[in-house]
């Protein structure tokens, strides 16, 4: 059995292509089932987000499994198989495990260390699990990846530092006020940057936000979309008298907020702090305003310095997380190798305990007058002999899990003890066939 991961992401395809190979949420369950019907696929999980579509699969043979996954993607989105090959990357074995761990922990994201992907990966796994397309290996591996990502984020704080301008703007406001929940904010501009700023403000806990825009209808649309208030640009001077935070992103020809405007309202505000954050180029806020008492004015250069510093912090955290991945891969491999050992140990124990049971039956026939107490003592001691005899062979069997020739040596081990253990590969195939029948039956029942 082999682990194959095929990924179409921001490194392998531009956004025009990525838009065409994204599964709708309501189509993902059926997509899991369709891929799972392929004989070469033993387990599968499909991850589909705005920046990546990925198929993770346990396959019987790498070449065949890879082809069927690529064919599945091509048929799903109306491409040729060669097109999918050109826009995707293929990872196999340890490389596939590393890729899964990097993606889940945010190391492969456009925004380094972002946490949204962790939730998306968890949802993808749960959907596959509920659909019935995961088995022993993926049920273990995906839980391991999710646990690893959670631990990595909590131990390194990789996602705590802002690396986008709009998010950094809110972080600057926090540096002045601390908690922002009780504050009032004004966002000037109803474009993309204005909406991003609004979302980051709402995400920080602020609920009292006013959208201000030259075109009132645009402000109204954005405000109603996010359940906040709105006003015209002419209302800005009066809003400045009571607001705490202003984020401006209009790129107007003239300054939206001038020195004279702020001087006028500062007399009304007295000692209340006002944070002005200008993320527009050219600037919306006249330079020099921060010379006025309790007025804090930041422009894009200030934000860039913060973003650059935070990005360096994230990169250091990412290096720490990446350094832990080899250990996780080793842990996974040890677990996988034990899958072949456990049935052998189980078969050895079963044979030994059968011998013990047969011995006790023989004793019962030859010594029928034994008391129940005497029988229990004999049974206990024969089991003890069995366990002591098995101790070293079982230890040797477990050590074979890390041996490069483990399959050959486990076969020899079975021959020596005349046992026949269940083949995990055959077990996986049988489990897959059983789950596939259940999925098919569910489809037929749902259709009827």
From Swiss-Prot:
InterPro entries: 4pyrrol_synth_GluRdtase, 4pyrrol_synth_GluRdtase_dimer, 4pyrrol_synth_GluRdtase_N, GluRdtase_CS, GluRdtase_dimer_dom_sf, GluRdtase_N_sf, NAD(P)-bd_dom_sf, Shikm_DH/Glu-tRNA_Rdtase. Substrate binds at residues 49-52, 109, 114-116, 120. The keyword Oxidoreductase applies. Its EC number is 1.2.1.70. Pathway: Porphyrin-containing compound metabolism; protoporphyrin-IX biosynthesis; 5-aminolevulinate from L-glutamyl-tRNA(Glu): step 1/2. Possesses an unusual extended V-shaped dimeric structure with each monomer consisting of three distinct domains arranged along a curved 'spinal' alpha-helix. The N-terminal catalytic domain specifically recognizes the glutamate moiety of the substrate. The second domain is the NADPH-binding domain, and the third C-terminal domain is responsible for dimerization. HAMAP family: Glu_tRNA_reductase. Catalyzes the NADPH-dependent reduction of glutamyl-tRNA(Glu) to glutamate 1-semialdehyde (GSA). Belongs to the glutamyl-tRNA reductase family. This is Glutamyl-tRNA reductase. The lineage of its organism: Bacteria, Bacillati, Bacillota, Bacilli, Bacillales.
